[in-house]
């Protein structure tokens, strides 16, 4: 799956055509009020660009929340239609379903350039292919019904544009099931693919990956794949304690220890050695007597270790210097997972100083990519999203890319001729 060879919305001729755009309008709602419209704002460049090309109409489709394959007004996209109208400064026609005769009729009789927003795709079990009931029991969708649902979506479109990178790791009907001749990436999706291609397909070296997070077992595939690509690897966050205990028999007190992940540590270290990857682990820690923002604070290093009843919640000043030196050498940086419990101010210094180093690196022209999830939250919290090369919008999707997996929503896009 080449990331850099996918058709872009700019490669299309959409004049006079029905353009189906899969967007990610999965916004947080408080009742019917949108509490953060960032995802809607992020889709505007693609929508406006297509609109300028004078299409017959634009059909916007998204999911919202987890309605589990049935209609649930709590997850209606109606509030999104109102917000989108405000942001675009023009009428958006909200349709009460995403398939069916009413939808077909509305799209067929569209006036020039009309913008439609379909109701939540996940009101149909055929979008995800399965659903869970309230007891967590899974029901699979009938394959014939899925096929029909995909055909109904396809019948609305002459051209397909996907701008929902955050859902690209899901083989859902709206992501992979529209069989139209041209399937292109929108601007958001294109930017994600462009930056991940810069890191994973053709990185400027030295290439540094920074990994945080709690469990080694969650990141084994990620570490294993990156050890084939990077020159340096920082392992921080909670999972560093599993490495330190296994490799140096360091006492870790009540810090996180991942029994399952521990079995893989020596193999990963051996692979790093074999591939000449410099593995960088913290050497000192900021510790706490409990997992709490008001905890007592102390320090420890890897010579004496962390005493009983204490836990490491951040990396200490020597570790920060080690990490800063690695960042200063790197020309390409991918960062997934913070090195400390940044949600508590007393244990945020390691994350904040690493972020400052990353911003400095980006400012002198290096490629600095932040994977989605917690690390993206950190970049937002400290207001530096615009100072980094790229902050991914897709936590799960970016993680799977870094693990070396194919993303169904990307594979389904047309390649450039």
From Swiss-Prot:
GO terms for molecular function: ADP binding; ATP binding; metal ion binding; phosphoglycerate kinase activity. GO terms for cellular component: cytosol; mitochondrion. CDP binds at residues 213, 218, 237, 337, 342. (2R)-3-phosphoglycerate binds at residues 23-26, 38-39, 62-63, 65-66, 121-122, 169-170. It catalyses: (2R)-3-phosphoglycerate + ATP = (2R)-3-phospho-glyceroyl phosphate + ADP. Pathway: Carbohydrate degradation; glycolysis; pyruvate from D-glyceraldehyde 3-phosphate: step 2/5. This is Phosphoglycerate kinase. The lineage of its organism: Eukaryota, Fungi, Dikarya, Ascomycota, Saccharomycotina.
